[in-house]
A protein has these predicted regions:
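Short hydrophobic alpha-helical segments enriched in small aliphatic residues
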Residues: 3, 8-10, 19-21
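Intrinsically disordered, low-complexity segments enriched in serine/proline and basic residues
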Residues: 13-14
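OB-fold nucleic-acid-binding modules
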Residues: 24-45
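OB-fold single-stranded nucleic acid-binding module
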Residues: 54-64, 77-78, 84-130
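Short, acidic/hydrophobic/Gly-rich beta-strand patch recurrent on exposed beta strands
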Residues: 67-72, 236
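Acidic/His-rich, divalent-metal-binding segments that scaffold phosphate/diphosphate chemistry
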Residues: 125-247
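Divalent metal-dependent catalytic cores for phosphoryl transfer on phosphate-bearing substrates
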Residues: 184-186, 195-196, 206-325
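N-terminal intrinsically disordered, cationic/polar leader segments
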Residues: 305, 329-348
Length: 348
């Protein structure tokens, strides 16, 4: 295989400090970072990545090797260390930032990095923003827009409930702003939970204007709260993985409990209104087979399930097309969430 060395492009070089220890130093020079989405088969790379997963295994012949999942803000990359004990392979763990040198190959149609050298890097050698997927929208601006919707709520108990989370609780605000809405499916990035919740709430606001039978205050409140349980279902970045409660209970149950617990602290909160709000959260996936404990039995619950489905699927399409040139109209392959193959439409 022909390997094209990227040292010239990146200005980044490994050199051995001691031939016996195999300690390697990454020389920091002015360079452009090589993101995972830009990597191509046949290239040699010297780069820093977040090691999201590190697992040891054995080949069929009984030889030990390490399998890694490397991450930056553009995606993930499978990597293998075929000789873990060799010179130039330093000790590191999952969730460490590591400098790697290796060759990009292909396995079963997917890119894979064959790691030749690796070391754990120290703070100051990397910028965390390069390694975590982040919303391309302004997070503070989105949060202010969300608070604007909260300010528009007229029902005093619902407004108090919303404000107790989103206005009066600084720790909650910080968590909600930066949390992901999913592990992989859609909005799986820093700010994803906020972006998705705001978008769903805006869709619901539109629905309320189209259909006067809808209780706007109930619908908007349910939309803002519908995925609040993901704060406990998913761990924070860089892990962004399911917690024990996430596996055992799921975000729908967790979120309903979070809202129910806070409702009990608000004097004279109407019992019927509390039940309707919790029903909307419980039913927001729309169908039992999609994970909802209840099917929508209120028009607001039905509208919320539509809004959630619209935003999840349109974001999935956006993320698919985000990695495809604008003039590319090729079919992108079957997508599980969309239950369809998809391509860009033609331009007039």
């Amino acid at each position: 295989m022909h390997v094209r060395n990227r040292n010239v492009d990146t200005g980044m070089r490994f050199r051995s400090r001691n031939a016996d220890t195999g300690i390697i130093i990454l020389e920091n020079k002015s360079r452009n970072k090589e993101y995972i989405e830009s990597l191509r088969e046949g290239e040699r790379i010297n780069e820093i990545y977040l090691c999201k997963v590190k697992q040891s295994a054995l080949t069929k012949a009984g030889k030990p090797y390490d399998t890694l999942i490397l991450q930056d803000k553009t995606g993930t990359l499978d990597a293998k260390i075929w000789e873990p004990g060799s010179v130039g392979i330093d000790e590191f763990d999952s969730l460490d930032y590591i400098a790697v040198m290796g060759d990009i190959t292909s396995f079963q149609g997917n890119l894979q990095l064959n790691v030749k050298r690796v070391r754990k890097v120290q703070e100051g050698e990397y910028d965390p923003k390069d390694y975590l997927p982040v919303s391309d929208k302004d997070i503070d601006q989105m949060y202010e827009e969300l608070k604007g919707l909260i300010a528009s709520i007229k029902e005093v108990h619902l407004k108090k409930l919303l404000e107790s989370f989103f206005v009066e609780d600084a720790d909650f605000e910080k968590r909600f702003k930066f949390h992901s809405a999913a592990k992989t499916v859609h909005h799986g990035f820093v700010g994803g939970l906020l972006e998705h919740s705001l978008s769903v709430a805006k869709h619901c606001d539109y629905f309320a204007g189209c259909y006067p039978m809808l209780n706007r205050d109930l619908l908007i409140t349910a939309a803002i709260f519908h995925d609040i349980g993901k704060l406990e279902e998913l761990s924070t970045f860089p892990e962004n993985d399911y917690t024990d409660d996430g596996q055992l209970l799921g975000h729908i149950i967790i979120g309903t409990e979070m809202v129910g617990d806070r409702i009990r602290t608000i004097p004279d909160f109407p019992k019927g209104l509390a039940s309707e709000l919790k029903h909307c959260i419980l039913a927001h996936h729309g169908e039992l087979e999609f994970g909802s404990p209840k099917k929508p039995a209120l028009p607001e619950a039905l509208a919320l399930s539509f809004a959630d489905n619209i935003d999840a699927k349109m974001e999935t399409v956006r993320e698919i097309f985000n990695n495809v040139p604008e003039n590319n109209q090729e079919w992108q392959g079957y997508n599980r969430l969309l239950e369809s193959n998809i391509r860009r439409s033609g331009k007039l």
